[in-house]
């Protein structure tokens, strides 16, 4: 029997980002966490729905990622669920993201949080906002693909 508990690799996904943005390029970033945050992440108490990434003073920061503290969290440390958390990226990656964000219509959003060995990683992406008609067309394409799969499944039974 192993000492370490096996946990699924993906902790949380930001499905809203995939709906609202066209993803152009993805990056893997480390994240600076406190002990109680890691415990909460192991328990699955993470929400990434409205989170976003900003570059300030040459450093990447994750905003609005809610990590809800457990009831058994330390009482001598004030737990802020919506705290701003530092992302760990190479200088080259930060410069690339900064260059694209400064262009009109581009932003940086987190897509997923996952385990890579004992560490928590955040997948962030350079993205461009979708227009309403693009979202509608994407939904129509998804619906048609689902219907097509159903028809083929019935035809080949």
UniProtKB/Swiss-Prot annotation:
Region (Disordered): 132-157
Range of residues in the leader sequence: none
GO CC terms, sorted: cytosol
Cross-referenced SUPFAM superfamilies: Small protein B (SmpB)
Residue ranges, compositional bias (Basic and acidic residues): 135-157
Transmembrane segments: none
Molecular function in Gene Ontology: RNA binding
Pfam families: SmpB
Entry's Gene Ontology BP terms: trans-translation
Subcellular location: Cytoplasm
Keywords: Cytoplasm, RNA-binding
Keyword Cytoplasm part of the UniProt annotation: yes
Highest taxon of source: Bacteria
Function: Required for rescue of stalled ribosomes mediated by trans-translation. Binds to transfer-messenger RNA (tmRNA), required for stable association of tmRNA with ribosomes. tmRNA and SmpB together mimic tRNA shape, replacing the anticodon stem-loop with SmpB. tmRNA is encoded by the ssrA gene; the 2 termini fold to resemble tRNA(Ala) and it encodes a 'tag peptide', a short internal open reading frame. During trans-translation Ala-aminoacylated tmRNA acts like a tRNA, entering the A-site of stalled ribosomes, displacing the stalled mRNA.
Record family assignment: Belongs to the SmpB family.
Name of the molecule in the record: SsrA-binding protein
Gene: smpB
């Amino acid at each position: 029997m192993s000492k370490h508990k096996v946990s699924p690799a993906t902790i949380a996904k930001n499905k809203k980002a995939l709906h609202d943005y066209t993803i152009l390029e993805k990056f893997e970033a480390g994240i600076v966490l406190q002990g109680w945050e890691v415990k909460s992440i192991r328990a699955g108490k993470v929400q990434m729905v409205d989170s976003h990434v900003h570059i300030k003073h040459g450093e990447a920061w994750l905003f609005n990622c809610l990590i809800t503290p457990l009831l058994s969290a330390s009482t001598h440390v004030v737990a802020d669920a919506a705290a701003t958390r530092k992302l760990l990226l190479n200088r080259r990656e930060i410069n690339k993201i900064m260059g694209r964000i400064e262009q009109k219509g581009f932003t940086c959003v987190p897509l997923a949080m996952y385990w890579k060995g004992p560490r928590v990683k955040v997948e962030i992406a350079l993205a461009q906002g979708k227009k309403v008609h693009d979202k509608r067309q994407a939904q129509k394409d998804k619906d048609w693909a689902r219907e097509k799969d159903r028809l083929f499944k019935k035809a080949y039974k």
